[in-house]
Amino acid sequence: EWDKVIGTLSKEHTVYTIDLLGCGKSDKPAITYTCYLYVQLLTDFIRDIIGEKTDIVATGASASFVTAACQNIADQIDHIILVCPESIHALAKAPNHKSKLLAKIINIPIYGTFIYNVGARNTALSDSAECKYLYASILGHYTTVNVAHCLEGLTTSIAVITGKNAPETSQKADEYCHILPSIEHLEVPGSGLLPQRENANAFLEQIDLLLSDNC
């Protein structure tokens, strides 16, 4: 996801790319993954590993973890850049009886694994059967948080980058700007849901502009 921009960013910044628990090359224990878990992991990583003021660039549903973490350690976060974040409405969904039942069904060894293989096909969670526990947690709304509440009162510099060829991402960005008018919204031409891959040069120009006051 970030392979086309890491090299350039690393020339002027120390770059950490994190595979959160249950994702990518990280461990994938058979647990219920929650927003609180990811907030704690992110908070601990910034405090214990990075150990200095940090800029965060996150995509999609990770917006919930980042904004929630910022409430805990706002003094250690300089900039937040959200790339095509999930809508605030979608991230506000809380676990209910139906979603909890769905999560339990997916966690069933055989039948649940079949549902996972069909439902997660062609997604970032399709590379391993072990990912089904995170998939179940997402569908169960365990990984969501009230982002609108998290944004209120934040003074951290926040920007949203979207792809110009995906107008729905611009609409989602407007939700964030409506909650916190200080949020800056930038569009990357010639790109859709993954501007950092689809037009890496233009994406890097926007990142450089947003982080230029750090240099």
Language-model segments: residues:
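Catalytic active-site module of serine/aspartate enzymes centered on a nucleophile-bearing elbow/loop
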Residues: 183-215
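Hydrophobic, aromatic-rich cap/lid helix
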Residues: 121-149, 165
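Structural signature of beta-strand start/N-cap positions in the alpha/beta core
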Residues: 14, 53-55, 77-79, 184
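Flexible "cap/lid" loop of the alpha/beta hydrolase fold
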Residues: 67-72, 77-109
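Active-site loop/oxyanion-hole signature of alpha/beta-hydrolase fold enzymes
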Residues: 3, 7, 16-57, 205
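Conserved loop-alpha-helix segment in the C-terminal half of the alpha/beta-hydrolase fold
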Residues: 7, 158-191, 197
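Gly/Ala-rich beta-loop-alpha elbow adjacent to hydrolase catalytic centers
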Residues: 58-66
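Alpha/beta-hydrolase active-site loop signature
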Residues: 20-24, 87, 192-195
